Amino acid sequence: MGMMQEFKAFAVKGNVVDLAVAVIIGGAFGKIVDSLVQDIIMPVVGKIFGGLDFSNYYLPLNNQDISLTLVEAKKLGAVFAYGSFITILINFLILAFIIFQMVRMLSKLKRSEPPAEAPATPEEVVLLREIRDALKK
């Protein structure tokens, strides 16, 4: 079998195609969660804590003014952008929780499926067993 035929057989297998679809859907779902965190959750959290935008929280690692925005501060030197980290951490926790729930649901569905019936014993095997039993007598 040539290399191209082997690759085609590998690529067409269900698991590889399923994995590719999962990666694409996961990328799109990640963008939805990003939007959920940045556009809905973080503004509410910011409002609770006095209208602050967490994504602009940083500590300068040099002698620069802390009243600058994060983008301006990054242009002037190194910064410890802990607000951005908090936002990304919340994003990750939401995504991990949703994926955990999906895996949990799929496990329950798999457990509830009835086990597959064993294939019927081939007639040759049945015949050989009968011959064996007859010879034992």
Curated annotation (Swiss-Prot):
Question: What Gene3D superfamilies is this protein classified in?
Answer: Large-conductance mechanosensitive channel, MscL, domain 1
Q: Which InterPro entries match?
A: Mechanosensitive_channel_CS, MS_channel, MSC/AndL, MscL_channel
Keywords for this protein: Cell inner membrane, Cell membrane, Ion channel, Ion transport, Membrane, Transmembrane, Transmembrane helix, Transport
The answer to whether the entry has keyword Cytoplasm is no
Which regions span the lipid bilayer?
9-29, 32-52, 80-100
Where do the coiled-coil regions begin and end? none
Q: How does it sit in the membrane?
A: Multi-pass membrane protein
**GO CC entries:** plasma membrane
* GO terms for MF: mechanosensitive monoatomic ion channel activity
| Top-level taxon of the source organism | Bacteria
| One Pfam family of this chain | MscL
Compartmental location? Cell inner membrane
Give the family from UniProt.
Belongs to the MscL family.
Q: How is this protein organized at the quaternary level?
A: Homopentamer.
Explain the purpose of this protein. Answer: Channel that opens in response to stretch forces in the membrane lipid bilayer. May participate in the regulation of osmotic pressure changes within the cell.
PANTHER family per the UniProt record, alphabetical: LARGE-CONDUCTANCE MECHANOSENSITIVE CHANNEL (PTHR30266:SF2), MECHANOSENSITIVE CHANNEL MSCL (PTHR30266)
Would you tell me the protein name for this molecule? Large-conductance mechanosensitive channel
Task: Tell me which species this is from.
Answer: Herminiimonas arsenicoxydans
Q: Supply the source organism's classification.
A: Bacteria, Pseudomonadati, Pseudomonadota, Betaproteobacteria, Burkholderiales
| Protein encoded by which gene | mscL
